[in-house]
Design a protein with these regions (language model features):
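Inter-helical turn/loop segments and adjacent helix faces that build the functional surface
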Residues: 20-25, 97-106, 130-131, 155-173
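Function-dense linear segments that define catalytic or interfacial modules
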Residues: 39-138, 150-154
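Polar, glycine-rich mid-to-C-terminal structural blocks
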Residues: 1-42
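A general alpha-helix detector
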Residues: 34, 150-154, 170
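Aromatic-lined, polymer-binding surfaces characteristic
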Residues: 141-148
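Conserved mixed alpha/beta core segments that line enzyme active sites in large multi-domain catalysts
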Residues: 28-35, 40, 50-74, 188-209
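Internal maturation/activation junctions in enzymes
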Residues: 111-135, 158-209
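Electropositive phosphate-/nucleotide-binding environments in soluble metabolic enzymes
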Residues: 25, 29, 85, 106, ...
Length: 211
């Protein structure tokens, strides 16, 4: 491995994203070690691999030449940005501790997706001119995100070991249930209210629910 040889030059330029000028040159290896050490000690920073994220962009955004350049600070949002677009977080979460109470309610996930879509509409209609790029992004892709919390509490409540095969199976069941219902809802909303303008196939209302 050439990167392990003593004479390998691992100089890494730190570039100001606005001026595009190199502001400092550091050792890539030393920087990576610092990142990993801090991650182990504090749980931060969250790491995002740009190539992997862009490979997973919806095809209709790839066709427009859009790219993800960064995430939000918590790394749960990976949306395309450029000179016209500023990413907008429109999020909600389900509480998995009570999964058994809501999983059989057919309108539970659909109502949440519809609520998030309504929040986007309110933002688009009422955002001030200073947020024009955020408004444009929200209007074009209508991205929403439905996350989850409380998985550990569900396992504790039901005396299920965290690293057990049963826990893994339950995890798969929960998130498959959420994704299926969310995907179905955004496709239904595309028929009812119209697809997001970015989607040239006119199949989805909300970009984040399409993969």
């Amino acid at each position: 491995n050439a990167t392990r040889t003593p004479d390998f030059d691992d100089s890494w330029n730190l570039i100001d994203p606005h001026s595009k000028l190199v502001v400092k040159t550091v050792s890539a290896r030393a920087l990576w070690v610092k990142i990993l050490q801090n991650r182990m000690e504090t749980g931060e920073p969250y790491l995002m691999f740009e190539d992997a994220v862009n490979n997973d962009l919806p095809d209709f955004q790839k066709r427009k030449g859009l790219k993800v350049h960064h995430s939000n600070l918590c790394s749960e949002i990976t949306l395309a940005t450029d000179e016209e677009r500023t990413a907008v977080c429109c999020l909600s979460s389900v509480n998995l501790e009570y999964y058994d109470e809501w999983k059989d309610h057919g309108s539970f996930i659909p109502d949440l997706i519809r609520m998030l879509d309504n929040v986007l509409t309110y933002f688009i209609d009422n955002a001030p001119s200073q947020l024009e790029r955020a408004k444009f992004s929200a209007q074009r892709e209508r991205s929403v995100g439905l996350g989850a919390m409380g998985f550990h509490a569900y396992l504790q409540k039901n005396d299920i070991p965290f690293e057990s095969g049963l826990a893994g199976g339950i995890n798969m069941e929960m998130f498959s249930h959420i994704k299926y219902n969310a995907d179905q809802t955004t496709r239904y909303l595309a028929i009812e209210k119209g697809a997001c303008p970015d989607d040239d196939t006119a199949s989805v209302r909300n970009r984040s629910e399409e993969r």
